[in-house]
From Swiss-Prot:
Part of the 30S ribosomal subunit. Interacts with proteins S7 and S18. Binds to IF-3. This is Small ribosomal subunit protein uS11. The keyword Ribosomal protein applies. It comes from Wolbachia sp. subsp. Drosophila simulans (strain wRi). Gene3D superfamilies: Ribosomal protein S11. NCBIfam families: PRK05309.1 (NF003698), uS11_bact (TIGR03632). Belongs to the universal ribosomal protein uS11 family. It holds the Pfam family Ribosomal_S11. One of its GO terms (cellular component) is ribonucleoprotein complex. The gene is rpsK.
Length: 128
């Protein structure tokens, strides 16, 4: 009986995409999607090998964005991205600079950090 050879999946190319950067006080998540919002690749500072207090640094956020950008360029041939930033973290500017240094063209940067209009009650104040 003959073995049936299967042909590998056809490589999809996404020239344009969206990079979502979620910067919290403890970590930074970088998610690369197509223009419809389907996730293509993602990474975080913790997944790049940083731990503890080093995860919240701008350098670590830049490294995570660099890893996500290289992944998107190699696997999908991405060239042009628009950036959406969410969260109050420190690494957002470093992440955008890292995307540009990897060869991606950044067309727009949107800050969509959620701002409460006096919504939920805050936690009690810490007494040290």
């Amino acid at each position: 009986m003959k073995k049936v050879k299967t042909v590998g999946k056809s490589k999809k190319e996404f020239i344009t995409g969206v990079v979502h950067i979620r910067a919290t006080f403890n970590n930074t998540f970088v998610n690369v999607t197509d223009v419809h919002g389907n996730t293509l690749c993602q990474t975080s500072v913790g997944a790049c090998g940083f731990s503890g207090s080093r995860k919240s640094t701008p350098y670590a956020a830049g490294k995570a964005a660099e890893a996500a950008a290289k992944n998107a360029i190699e696997r999908f041939g991405m060239k042009v991205v628009s950036v959406i930033i969410r969260g109050p973290g420190f690494g957002t500017e470093a992440a955008v600079k890292a995307l540009q240094s990897c060869g991606l063209t950044v067309t727009s940067i949107a800050d969509k950090t959620a701002i409460p209009h006096n919504g939920c009650r805050l936690r009690k104040k810490r007494r040290v």
